[in-house]
UniProtKB/Swiss-Prot annotation:
Gene3D superfamilies according to UniProt: Formyl transferase, C-terminal domain, Formyl transferase, N-terminal domain
Name of this protein: Methionyl-tRNA formyltransferase
EC number of the protein: 2.1.2.9
Catalytic activity: L-methionyl-tRNA(fMet) + (6R)-10-formyltetrahydrofolate = N-formyl-L-methionyl-tRNA(fMet) + (6S)-5,6,7,8-tetrahydrofolate + H(+)
Binding-site residues for (6S)-5,6,7,8-tetrahydrofolate, renumbered to this chain: S113, L114, L115, P116
Originating species: Pseudomonas syringae pv. tomato (strain ATCC BAA-871 / DC3000)
């Protein structure tokens, strides 16, 4: 084995924290952690540290939270750490070329897709939404472009018909860390050669927003079924029922035809709603002020709300 490396880690959400855990358990020295500034969160809107910051503080690792890495002071601070390598995972800040050039071995990134497919901010959810057969993690050498660098290695997992954005996220968070450790070993030995991405195969995974999660019942049922899975646990697909908000946490395909959004049937098996093509069976819902419930429980206690012929989304 080569000598342990001086590594700077940059990341923010839980997905990144799983990678940091693996690095902390490795022989390498984590000399500093970069993460996004604390953000307001929760009902009280208190400033909350990122999962990566919380983990770093538990291990007494210096934490840097510059609002940008374009400032000369921030770049000088990074250079003073004399890193051999920078590992970047869902950090959320652009790294200019001057920063990419600071570490002796450069910067690598663990990205939650099989590049060049799904460059960008929401690759996990977009893969589920599109009905992709597989996903994975790509470890790449970073360039100034967005997720465009040479690919060092990939770890692949199939996407099942039951996968949600959440379940795929958790599986990729397990695949990514060992892939990064393998890539670091290869870079340190000089045995790992990057493969250029084919830009003609690239597409962009746009950031999620709540407006996208509003169900358009004129869309085909299979498209909406994938959307429900992709947007769980956030932002959660939603509609309205008698002018009240209705969150849809789980659904599957059903037979049926009718005006889009119309309740075709309601039973303990689910609420069947007509779509632009075919129908969707809603199996887990959340009403205002309530917690998420299987439709069986809602049907037993609130069946009068789900009258046949009622139209959702009006």
């Amino acid at each position: 084995m080569t000598e342990p490396l001086r590594i700077v880690f940059a990341g923010t959400p839980e997905f990144a924290a799983e990678h940091l855990k693996a690095l902390l358990d490795s022989p390498h020295q984590i000399v500093a952690v970069y993460t996004q500034p604390d953000r307001p969160a929760g009902r009280g809107q208190k400033l909350m540290p990122s999962p990566v910051k919380q983990l770093a503080l538990q291990h007494d690792i210096p934490v840097m939270q510059p609002p940008t890495l374009r400032a000369p002071e921030a770049q000088a601070e990074l250079a003073a750490l004399k890193p051999d390598l920078m590992v970047v995972v869902a950090y959320g800040l652009i790294l200019p070329q001057v920063v990419l050039d600071i570490p002796r071995l450069g910067c690598i990134n663990s990205h939650a897709s099989l590049l060049p497919r799904w460059r960008g901010a929401a690759p996990i959810q977009r893969a589920v939404q599109a009905g992709d057969a597989e996903s994975g993690v790509t470890v790449m050498r970073m360039e100034a472009g967005l997720d465009t660098g040479p690919m060092l290695l990939k770890a692949v997992t199939p996407i099942s018909a039951q996968d949600t954005g959440g379940t795929l996220h958790d599986r990729l968070a397990e695949l990514g860390p060992p892939a990064v450790l393998q890539a670091i070993a290869g870079l340190a030995e000089g045995s790992l050669v990057g493969e250029a991405q084919d830009d003609s195969l690239a597409n962009y995974a746009h950031k999620l927003n709540k407006d996208e999660a509003r169900i358009d019942w004129t869309r085909p049922a299979d498209e909406l079924e994938r959307l429900v899975r992709a947007f769980n646990p956030w932002p959660i697909c939603h509609s309205t029922l008698n002018e009240e908000a209705l969150k849809v946490l789980a659904a599957d395909l059903a037979e049926g035809q009718g005006a889009p959004g119309t309740i075709l049937s309601a039973s303990k098996d689910g609420l069947i709603v007509a779509c632009g093509q075919n129908a969707l069976r809603l199996t887990r819902l959340q009403l205002p002020g309530g917690k998420p419930l299987n439709f069986t429980d809602l049907f037993n206690s609130r069946r009068e709300k789900f009258a046949i012929g009622t139209v959702l989304g009006q």
